[in-house]
Swiss-Prot record:
Keyword field contains Metal-binding: no
Alphabetized CDD domains for the sequence: Chorismate_synthase
GO cellular component terms given for this protein: cytosol
BP terms from Gene Ontology: amino acid biosynthetic process; aromatic amino acid family biosynthetic process; chorismate biosynthetic process
Binding site for FMN: R126, A127, S128, G297, K312, P313, T314, P315, S316, R339
Keywords, ordered alphabetically: Amino-acid biosynthesis, Aromatic amino acid biosynthesis, FAD, Flavoprotein, FMN, Lyase, NADP
SUPFAM superfamilies to which the protein is assigned, alphabetical: Chorismate synthase, AroC
Annotated catalysed reactions: 5-O-(1-carboxyvinyl)-3-phosphoshikimate = chorismate + phosphate
The protein, known as: Chorismate synthase
A Gene Ontology molecular function term of the record: chorismate synthase activity
Lineage of the species this protein comes from: Archaea, Methanobacteriati, Methanobacteriota, Stenosarchaea group, Methanomicrobia
Amino acid sequence: MMSGSTFGTLFRVTTWGESHGRAIGVVVDGCPAGIELSEMDVQRELDRRRPGQSTATTERHEADSVEILSGIFEGITTGTPISMLVWNRDARSSHYDSIRHTPRPGHADYTYHVKYGIRDHRGGGRASARETVGRVAAGAVARKLLSEFGVEIAGYVSELGGISASLPRWTSRGSIEREELLDIRERAESSPIRCPDAAASSRMLSLLDSVRSDGDSIGGVVEVIAIGVPPGLGEPVFDKLDADLAKALMSIGAVKAVEIGAGFESARLRGSEMNDPLFYENGRISFERNNAGGILGGISTGAPILCRMAVKPTPSIARSQRTVDMVSGESVDISVRGRHDPSIPPRIVPVAEAMVALVLADHILRQRSARLR
């Protein structure tokens, strides 16, 4: 039994499907009735995630056209489960015949085999990045809910292959204006790398071309910011907001580390440097800086939510790598065929945004049941 495919408490999401199966999809349960939602709302987010958009992504071409099967009537959510489906159109399973019994280094081939005794070797099966189609579709629904509360989410690539973008130091500021965040998002979306720094984006692309020519891959850093998040979200002690965000982001394939706010830098700061001073502004409590990343004690403060994640290099590379043949019991060398992203961070951005949206939507619904007044 594979029991880890459902996420959330009140706003619950179950993804299903494999990379080379007939289709892939998601069921969203717990979305309140009365929210305007169309296939175009979902398609807009899926188009940002889909492969084949630039030289920075895999050459697999999938339209990723979504079909909403239930939960919507005349463009309005009904409060019943929302089921969404995307057909797989461009799978080339023959590319994977040679690795049926030879687990690829860096992939989940070996661990899925050990756990279940059987695995779908075609494109990674359930462990493929293709699974994130369902996450992004569900995230589109969550974002429609969050828009009712004025929440905005934006993600971007801040580092790729050791090349860093020149960006504001968000932790040094207690707030981020909506216009500034939307500008960052627009600049990121205009870049094939999804990096809002045009000069850094150009250097990243050049590096990516070089790495691809070498038959190799590179990783990077993705950041996600959420503003307009109301204070009070989070359920201590085990369902803290930052704990759920970390789980959500770590559940994305290739993500190897997550930071909230100052993150690992906080280990090098003194308390006087780490603590965010409070002050009154227009009758409301605000913060002079945001090392906490918008969360204290597992509960949102109302300041921007700041998340960063380290994304490892794509494990599928053309270079020869040592592995084993699980039938013959011998050591062998393989080079991975197929169409793969030379670097994953640009495509992880909409997935990471979706996971943050799912967590915030879930906690907004939970908070509405936490107190009467």
